[in-house]
C-alpha cells in the first residue's frame, strides 16, 4: 500500500464559523454536599482550550500549516483567553470582537475522568455582523487553498450560501461540517462531512451500505455537491462522489476515551490535504487516521505530525514511541488525565543488553506508562569519553522504542535530565544502580510534586562496558 505523508508543504487554509472557548475544571469528589444530593468537586486544575471553529483552526496549526480564523467573539475574558490561545499557536486571528454579545463558552466539570456537568454561556450571534464577515472573506479567500465553514448553529454562518458562492467564484474548495437538517443552505459546497446521525436525519434510516450509497449520491445531486463524506463512528467513514465507486475506510481507533472534537479533526485534515493538492482518497485516509488518534485523548484535542505519521504507518499505538519534548508533554498530560501512572527513567543505553531489558521491564511494572530519557551523542561523550557512544542517538532510541515495556523515548542534551524531569513531573522516578534516592537527578522536583523516587538493581555482570570488552577480546 502507498504510504502517505503527513507533511503539507503547500497547504494554507481559512476557517470561518462558530468560535467557542472550552473550559475544563478538574477535581476530586469525595463527599456529597450537605445542601443537596450532589457531589462536591474540589477543583484542582483548570484548562482552557479552543472550541468549535477555533478548535478546527488549532487542528490545522498543529500540523504546521498556515491557517486564519474568522468568526465572532465577545469583548470579554473568554474572548481574550481565546485570542491568547490562538496567538500562541501562530493562528491568524481575524475574529470580530463585539461588545454586544459574550464569547460562546462551554464549561465542563470533570472528576475521576468522568464529565459531571456542562455549563453553556452563550447568546449566539444571530443577525449580527454577517456583512462584515462576508466582506472579509471576499478580500482574503484567494490567498487560501481551502475554506472550512464550521457550523454549530450559533449564527455566525447565517450568510453561508453567499460564503459558498464567494469561494466558488474564487475557485477555492469549500468544506462544511453541517448542522441541522436544512442542507439546502449548503447548496454548491464542495464537500459535506455529516456524521451518520446527521446524514440519516436528512435522508432517512439506511439499513445497509448500499442504501447509504444510494441516498448519499441522491443528496449530492440534489444539493449540487462535489462529494460527501459520511463519518460512521466505529464503522469508519464513506466517501461518495458521482460516477465513482464509493470509498470505504474502517476506523483506526484502538481505544476511545472521548469523541469531543473528533469531527473538527476530520474536516481539518481533509481540508489541509485538499489544499495541499492531495486526491480525495488520500485526504480521507489521512483524516481517518487522525480521527483514530484524537478519540484516544480526553477533551477537545488536536493531532501532531508525529502522531499522524505513527497512525499512517499502522504503529501499534499513536502518540507513543520517539517524541520531541513538547510532544511528550502533551502525551503525558493526556495520560495523567486518564488516570495513568507515569514512570520515568534515563540513561545512555549505548549497547542494549539483557540487564537493560530486565531493568526496563521491572520499571514498567511499577506504573502504566514508561518514559525513557536518552542522552544525546554529545552528552554521552562528555560522560563516557570520546570513544562513546558506539551507537548514535537515533539507533539507540529506535531500539528502545521497539521494546514492549517502553511507551515513550525522548532525548536530552544536558549531562543530567533534571530540567526535563522537572518539566514532565512523572509520578515515579526510577534509576538503576547503587544510588541513594536523594542523589538521583530530578528527585527533588518529583518529591516536591508529590511523586515517588525508587532505585532498582541491575542484573549482576550485565553492563555496556563488559559487552564492549567482550567484543574487543573476540577480535
UniProtKB/Swiss-Prot annotation:
Q: Does the keyword Ribonucleoprotein apply?
A: no
A Gene Ontology annotation in the biological process aspect, one of them, is:
ADP-L-glycero-beta-D-manno-heptose biosynthetic process
SUPFAM superfamilies referenced in this protein's UniProt entry, alphabetically = Nucleotidylyl transferase, Ribokinase-like
Q: In which pathway does it act?
A: Nucleotide-sugar biosynthesis; ADP-L-glycero-beta-D-manno-heptose biosynthesis; ADP-L-glycero-beta-D-manno-heptose from D-glycero-beta-D-manno-heptose 7-phosphate: step 1/4; Nucleotide-sugar biosynthesis; ADP-L-glycero-beta-D-manno-heptose biosynthesis; ADP-L-glycero-beta-D-manno-heptose from D-glycero-beta-D-manno-heptose 7-phosphate: step 3/4
Spell out the reaction equation it catalyses: D-glycero-beta-D-manno-heptose 7-phosphate + ATP = D-glycero-beta-D-manno-heptose 1,7-bisphosphate + ADP + H(+); D-glycero-beta-D-manno-heptose 1-phosphate + ATP + H(+) = ADP-D-glycero-beta-D-manno-heptose + diphosphate
- Segments carrying the region annotation (Cytidylyltransferase) are 344-475
Question: EC no.?
Answer: 2.7.1.167, 2.7.7.70
Identify the InterPro entries for this entry. Answer: Bifunc_HldE (IPR023030), Carboh/pur_kinase_PfkB_CS (IPR002173), Cyt_trans-like (IPR004821), PfkB_dom (IPR011611), RfaE_dom_I (IPR011913), RfaE_dom_II (IPR011914), Ribokinase-like (IPR029056), Rossmann-like_a/b/a_fold (IPR014729)
- Extract the GO molecular function terms from the UniProt entry: ATP binding; heptose 7-phosphate kinase activity; heptose-1-phosphate adenylyltransferase activity; phosphotransferase activity, alcohol group as acceptor
Q: Which amino acids does the record list as binding ATP? A: 195-198
The role this protein plays is: Catalyzes the ADP transfer from ATP to D-glycero-beta-D-manno-heptose 1-phosphate, yielding ADP-D-glycero-beta-D-manno-heptose.
Q: Identify the NCBIfam families for this entry.
A: cyt_tran_rel, PRK11316.1, rfaE_dom_I, rfaE_dom_II
Family in the record: In the N-terminal section; belongs to the carbohydrate kinase PfkB family. In the C-terminal section; belongs to the cytidylyltransferase family.
**Matching HAMAP family:** HldE
Quaternary structure, from the entry:
Homodimer.
Know the name of this protein?
Answer: Bifunctional protein HldE
Amino acid at each position: 500500500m502507498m504510504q502517505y505523508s503527513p507533511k503539507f508543504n503547500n497547504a494554507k487554509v481559512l476557517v470561518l464559523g462558530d468560535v467557542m472557548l472550552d473550559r475544563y475544571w478538574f477535581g476530586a469528589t469525595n463527599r456529597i454536599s450537605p445542601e443537596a444530593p450532589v457531589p462536591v468537586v474540589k477543583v484542582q486544575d483548570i484548562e482552557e482550550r479552543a472550541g468549535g471553529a477555533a478548535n478546527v483552526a488549532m487542528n490545522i496549526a498543529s500540523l504546521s500549516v498556515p491557517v486564519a480564523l474568522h468568526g465572532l467573539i465577545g469583548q470579554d475574558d473568554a474572548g481574550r483567553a481565546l485570542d491568547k490561545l490562538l496567538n500562541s499557536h501562530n493562528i491568524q486571528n481575524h475574529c470580530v470582537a463585539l461588545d454586544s454579545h459574550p464569547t460562546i463558552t462551554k464549561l465542563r466539570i470533570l472528576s475521576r475522568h468522568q464529565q459531571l456537568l456542562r455549563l453553556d454561556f452563550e447568546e449566539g450571534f444571530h443577525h449580527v455582523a454577517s456583512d462584515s464577515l462576508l466582506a472579509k472573506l471576499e478580500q482574503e479567500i484567494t490567498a487560501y487553498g481551502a475554506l472550512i465553514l464550521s457550523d454549530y448553529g450559533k449564527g455566525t454562518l447565517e450568510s453561508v450560501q453567499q460564503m459558498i458562492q464567494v469561494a466558488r467564484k474564487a475557485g477555492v474548495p469549500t468544506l462544511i461540517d453541517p448542522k441541522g437538517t436544512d442542507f439546502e443552505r449548503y447548496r454548491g459546497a464542495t464537500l459535506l462531512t455529516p456524521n451518520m446521525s446527521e446524514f440519516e436525519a436528512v435522508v432517512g434510516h439506511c439499513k445497509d451500505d448500499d442504501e447509504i450509497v444510494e441516498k448519499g449520491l441522491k443528496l449530492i445531486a440534489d444539493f449540487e455537491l462535489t462529494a460527501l463524506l459520511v463519518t460512521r463512528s466505529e464503522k469508519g467513514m464513506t466517501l461518495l462522489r458521482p460516477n465513482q465507486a464509493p470509498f470505504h475506510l474502517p476506523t483506526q481507533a484502538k481505544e476511545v476515551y472521548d469523541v469531543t472534537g473528533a469531527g473538527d479533526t476530520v474536516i481539518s485534515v481533509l481540508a489541509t490535504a485538499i489544499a495541499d493538492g492531495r486526491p480525495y482518497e488520500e485526504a480521507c485516509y489521512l483524516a481517518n487516521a487522525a480521527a483514530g488518534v484524537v478519540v484516544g485523548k480526553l477533551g477537545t484535542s488536536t493531532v501532531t505530525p508525529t502522531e499522524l505519521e505513527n497512525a499512517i504507518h499502522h504503529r501499534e499505538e499513536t502518540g507513543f514511541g520517539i517524541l520531541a519534548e513538547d510532544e511528550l508533554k502533551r502525551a503525558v498530560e493526556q495520560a495523567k488525565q486518564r488516570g495513568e501512572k507515569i514512570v520515568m527513567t534515563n540513561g545512555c543505553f549505548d549497547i542494549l543488553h539483557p540487564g537493560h531489558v530486565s531493568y526496563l521491564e521491572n520499571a514498567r511494572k511499577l506504573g502504566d506508562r514508561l518514559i525513557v530519557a536518552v542522552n544525546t551523542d554529545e552528552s554521552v561523550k562528555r560522560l563516557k569519553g570520546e570513544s562513546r557512544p558506539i551507537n548514535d542517538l537515533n539507533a539507540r532510541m529506535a531500539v528502545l522504542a521497539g521494546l514492549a515495556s517502553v511507551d515513550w523515548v525522548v532525548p536530552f542534551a544536558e549531562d543530567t535530565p533534571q530540567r526535563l524531569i522537572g518539566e514532565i513531573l512523572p509520578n515515579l522516578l526510577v534509576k538503576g544502580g547503587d544510588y541513594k534516592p536523594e542523589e538521583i537527578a530530578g528527585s527533588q522536583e518529583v518529591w516536591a510534586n508529590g511523586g515517588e523516587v525508587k532505585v532498582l538493581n541491575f542484573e549482576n555482570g550485565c553492563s555496556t562496558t563488559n559487552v564492549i570488552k567482550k567484543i574487543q577480546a573476540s577480535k
